[in-house]
Amino acid sequence: MLLIGVAGTELSAQERDWLQHDAVAGVVLFKRNFGSRSQVVELSAAIRAAAPRPVLICVDQEGGRVQRFREGFSALAPLQSFGAQYAQAPEAALAAARAHAQLMASEVRASGVDLSFAPVVDLGRGNRAIGDRAFSDDPQIVATFTRAYVQALHGAGMAATLKHFPGHGTVLEDTHVDHASDPRPLEALQAEDLVPFVAGIEAGADAVMMAHVVYPQVAPEPAGYSQRWIEQILRGQMGFRGVVFSDDIGMAASFSAGGVAGRVHAHLDAGCDVVLVCHPELVAESLQAVQGRRLNTAALIGLIGRGALGWDGLLAGTDVSFTTPHSAHFGTTA
């Protein structure tokens, strides 16, 4: 199955045709797709109307610098702000993270979007792409926040996606623009980077997004192209039974599998349920690549939201004062 990107704030005729394809599981929305809150509601409805089956609509609404919907939405704190508070006030920090998850999920669902790919459970150890998206550099602290965040997302009716498996936070390279390799053995990863993923899976996380990072002491290919990582470790050893997403095949670190078709097949062959094709110019070739493949069409049904909440009153029960420990404006709508 493919999650595709679309070009703008309205669907084109070609994009409506793409949504008719059996392999299209849904759409990933970006800043380019956002004009206003009401426009996102209309776009989400148009996507569902164009598809002959239930589809998944997703976004990255993590908070901080990775927040695709801004005007009319709460300005959410980066996850690192909660980790920074934890040493002095752990219970308040966890309460803030739970409120952050509930508020984010409620606003996203009220816009007709099923899920935000969240939470980031990578360790905050200097990666250029992760940065303040991570809760902490301490595996146990990240694990504690992961449990709280997953539970809060579920309480707001949103599925939880752990990313980026098996851990993107320690390598320095940004896989959007460069290849990345982590030389540590599996035992070191199990003692550190995998700890939050174990916690998230135990908390009932619904999905995992793979990293485009190579761990050569474990497998020779990037994790998202690796049966060893997906089938043997994530599913076999760690017991994960949910949906496995690739990261975007338009990222530079994905190019090791060759062209567009090669990347799509490599992810599916490795055990990914869903391949992210975020760049519209790659969609047609990706659809051609999956012609004739057996696809896991049932995998995503559990991720589709439980029905959008109305925007009026969506904050009921949410203590917005906990959306950030540092700045009150993060808890109010912009």
UniProtKB/Swiss-Prot annotation:
Gene transcribed to yield this protein: nagZ
Site residues by UniProt (Important for catalytic activity): 174
EC number: 3.2.1.52
Any single Gene Ontology cellular-component annotation: cytoplasm
Sites where the protein binds substrate: 60, 68, 133, 163-164
Protein's cellular compartments: Cytoplasm
Family annotation (InterPro entries): Beta_hexosaminidase_bac, Glyco_hydro_3_AS, Glyco_hydro_3_N, Glyco_hydro_3_N_sf, Glycoside_hydrolase_SF, NagZ_Beta-hexosaminidase
Catalytic machinery residues: 176 (proton donor/acceptor), 247 (nucleophile)
Family per similarity comment: Belongs to the glycosyl hydrolase 3 family. NagZ subfamily.
SUPFAM superfamilies per UniProt: (Trans)glycosidases
Keywords: Cell cycle, Cell division, Cell shape, Cell wall biogenesis/degradation, Cytoplasm, Glycosidase, Hydrolase, Peptidoglycan synthesis
Function: Plays a role in peptidoglycan recycling by cleaving the terminal beta-1,4-linked N-acetylglucosamine (GlcNAc) from peptide-linked peptidoglycan fragments, giving rise to free GlcNAc, anhydro-N-acetylmuramic acid and anhydro-N-acetylmuramic acid-linked peptides.
Pathway membership: Cell wall biogenesis; peptidoglycan recycling
GO biological process: carbohydrate metabolic process; cell division; cell wall organization; peptidoglycan biosynthetic process; peptidoglycan turnover; regulation of cell shape
Top-level class of the enzyme under EC nomenclature: hydrolase
Organism: Xanthomonas oryzae pv. oryzae (strain MAFF 311018)
Main subcellular location of this protein, as a coarse class: cytoplasm
Keyword Cell division among record annotations: yes
Top-level taxon of the source organism: Bacteria
Entry protein name: Beta-hexosaminidase
Catalytic reaction equation(s): Hydrolysis of terminal non-reducing N-acetyl-D-hexosamine residues in N-acetyl-beta-D-hexosaminides
A Pfam family it matches: Glyco_hydro_3
UniProt GO molecular function: beta-N-acetylhexosaminidase activity
